[in-house]
C-alpha cells in the first residue's frame, strides 16, 4: 500500500503520474489530503479528490 499525500499547490503532473504508474503496476494507492478537505487544488487549478484525510 502506498499513500500519496497532497497539499494545496501540488504539481499536478508529478502527482497524477506517480498515482497512475503505481496503479498500472497493480499497487494499491490511496491519495491523502493533508488539508482540511478531501478536495485539493493544484498549482495550475486542477482539483483532486483524495481518498482520505490525514488527521
Regions found by a protein language model. Name each.
Residues 1-55:
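Extended, subdomain-level signal for the structured scaffold at the beginning of enzyme domains
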Amino acid at each position: 500500500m502506498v499513500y500519496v499525500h497532497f497539499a494545496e499547490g501540488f504539481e499536478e503532473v508529478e502527482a497524477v503520474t506517480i498515482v497512475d504508474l503505481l496503479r498500472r503496476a497493480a499497487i494499491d494507492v490511496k491519495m491523502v489530503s493533508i488539508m482540511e478537505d478531501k478536495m485539493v487544488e493544484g498549482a495550475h487549478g486542477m482539483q483532486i479528490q483524495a481518498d482520505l484525510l490525514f488527521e
